[in-house]
Amino acid sequence: MGKKSIIILAAGAGTRMKSDTPKVLHKISGKPMLYYSIKEALKLSDDITVVLYHQFEKVKAEIEKYFSNINFVIQDHKNYPGTGGAVMGITPKYEKVLVLNGDMPLIQANELEKFEINATIVMSVLELESADGYGRVIIENGNVKKIVEQKDASEDELKITTANAGIYQFETKFLLENLPKLDNNNAQKEYYITDLVEMAISQGKVLKPLVVNEENFKGVNSKVELADAEVIHQNRIKKEFMKAGVIMRLPDTIYIEEGVEIEGESIIENGVSLLGNAKIINSHIKTNSVVEDSIVKDSDVGPMGRVRPGSELTNTHIGNFVETKKAKLTGVKAGHLSYLGDCSIDEGTNIGCGTITCNYDGVNKHQTIIGKNVFVGSDTQFVAPVNIEDDVLIGAGSTVTGNVKKGELYLTRAKAKTIDGFFYKHFSSKKK
């Protein structure tokens, strides 16, 4: 396949989203919509230009978190609004240039490869059951002959179900020669990229239609369409993992973000959320658990466990209502209702119900270090920083405020006190 330049249009405000967030930064599976257009474009080209305008600094800053090898230009929206105005002033590196939209997060590189057709313009089209609401594309003898907007279409033209999908490939020479000829003599006073199609037809150029998959070329203009697109994207992610051998219980209830990795003989149960750069290796994530930006290897989590960013679990059991954050646990059992944050716990250690690492003093976070074969009784608080050596027993109800040496018993508990007959005296005094 010959090299080509790619321009991605991402300048619009997206007013139908009804949001202060720029349209292309609304997220699907944890990443901005624009991320996906760029990701797929980079599979085809090393000359990527993203056209911005609305909140361009915010969009640029967000996208630069993911990509460093693309170009950004700011559209002269005041003088040259519209899709045609967006590509003005760009000089593509290669002889062909593909123009994509930043609000098509379902686009895939293998579909874009199909634009490799010998023509002045290759225009993506949809074959629909009903093209109501779309501009119609008139095709004769395999060539595009006309584009007509629905409001301008004749009765016969309205019967046509071939519609414009909104992505084009141009010969760069034609594009650069004809962009200066565009005008804004229309109701919106904008410069339209579709006018280049009319110019090419009038010049007798070859314009080829490319029938594309409607799902892949779905544009997102509202939050309803955003939700619809995310459902499709989620299904794609989960099917790829299941094909690779991952078991998923009721996959429609599972949410997996872009960037998550799942390897080996892993089981993901219903209601699970895997977020950020979570990595699951040979592990069982049980019902309604959340794993975010953490590594879980040869372990089980949940049900209703929460593994927060920076955790690393190896050969570990995390039970119901246990939360970890920045916790390195190796060969640990924490079965019930505990918070383990900013800690390192070694193999053979059992964490009793209600254990808390008190890691924050109101200003700074502090570490709790627990060694091997430590038994932590229920309702224990570790007031960090503390270091618990190997083979230690922590009595239930203890508040640990200092280091504990190997082999010791640590116990902080008030002496029990009983008062004979107190119940009867206490309540009888209230009955009058």
Curated annotation (Swiss-Prot):
Annotated cofactor note: Binds 1 Mg(2+) ion per subunit.
Compartments where found: Cytoplasm
Residue sites binding Mg(2+) per the record: 103, 221
Leader sequence residues: none
Reaction(s) the record says it catalyses: alpha-D-glucosamine 1-phosphate + acetyl-CoA = N-acetyl-alpha-D-glucosamine 1-phosphate + CoA + H(+); N-acetyl-alpha-D-glucosamine 1-phosphate + UTP + H(+) = UDP-N-acetyl-alpha-D-glucosamine + diphosphate
Tagged with keyword RNA-binding: no
Primary localization class, coarse: cytoplasm
Residue numbers spanned by region N-acetyltransferase: 245-432
Keyword terms: Acyltransferase, Cell shape, Cell wall biogenesis/degradation, Cytoplasm, Magnesium, Metal-binding, Multifunctional enzyme, Nucleotidyltransferase, Peptidoglycan synthesis, Repeat, Transferase
Positions of region (Pyrophosphorylase): 1-223
Cofactor: Mg(2+)
Disulphide-bridged cysteine pairs: none
Residues that, per the record, bind acetyl-CoA: 359-360, 378, 396, 413
Active site: 336
Pathway: Nucleotide-sugar biosynthesis; UDP-N-acetyl-alpha-D-glucosamine biosynthesis; N-acetyl-alpha-D-glucosamine 1-phosphate from alpha-D-glucosamine 6-phosphate (route II): step 2/2; Nucleotide-sugar biosynthesis; UDP-N-acetyl-alpha-D-glucosamine biosynthesis; UDP-N-acetyl-alpha-D-glucosamine from N-acetyl-alpha-D-glucosamine 1-phosphate: step 1/1; Bacterial outer membrane biogenesis; LPS lipid A biosynthesis
Binding site for UDP-N-acetyl-alpha-D-glucosamine: 9-12, 23, 75, 82-83, 135, 149, 164, 221, 308, 325, 339, 350
GO cellular component: cytoplasm; membrane
UniProt record, GO biological process: cell morphogenesis; cell wall organization; lipid A biosynthetic process; peptidoglycan biosynthetic process; regulation of cell shape; UDP-N-acetylglucosamine biosynthetic process
Residue span of region Linker: 224-244
Pfam family name, one: NTP_transf_3
Protein name: Bifunctional protein GlmU
Upper taxonomic lineage: Bacteria, Pseudomonadati, Campylobacterota, Epsilonproteobacteria, Campylobacterales
